[in-house]
Structure formats: structure tokens, C-alpha cells
């Protein structure tokens, strides 16, 4: 078995920059829908899933301003539609994040089932059970 052997004895000093985590950022972005306040979210990874989710959110009326590659300013006060287009959702698995946020704020969400995954089947049945347990009526259509 390989191992690292580290001999200390010297004080450590310096800085480490930690980049944002994609899955945490997806949930945080969706949660920002819940408030009508303007929200600044920093330390976002610059990856496809984040960018597609932001596009999907813009398509339903969320105002998104890219401040830097890793920061956005968002305002969800003017969401005009709770139906997210399949063209966005087929590219990512994060659609279920939007379901919870839209249900929480508007008591309704029309969101296609998630796509974007080559890992294999990862159903969202536990999310659906949770929505039902909280009183939502869930209808799955083809």
C-alpha cells in the first residue's frame, strides 16, 4: 500500500483558495428563487450545469446579472412563469432543485424530469415522495 510520510516540525503559513462546489451551488441558486430580494452569490464554479440552470431561471423571469465568472446578482421578484422549458432541463440533472423552490414560493411548478447524466438511472422518486408528504399533488406526464 502506498503512503505519504510527512515530517513536521516547521510552522505552516499561507493561503488556500477553495473553489465552489457545483452541487452546493445548484441548490443555492435555486433557493434564491424563494426571496424577492436581490441576492449576490459568489464563488460559483464556472461549469456548464451552473450556466444552464441560470439560463433556465432567466427563461422564467429571474433577473440574472453576471458580475464575474464566479459571481451573479439575481432577483426573482418578477417570475412570470412556473413552467421550465425542456430545452434547458434536458441538459442537466438539477431540475428537481427548481421544483422545490417554485413549489415553496408559488405552490406550483411544471418542470421536466431531469436529463444530462451518463452515469445511469438516478430516479428522483425520493424528491417526489417528499413533495407529496408536504402536501403537493404530483402529476407525471409524458
PLM regions and their residue ranges:
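Structural preference for solvent-exposed beta-strand-turn elements
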Residues: 1-142
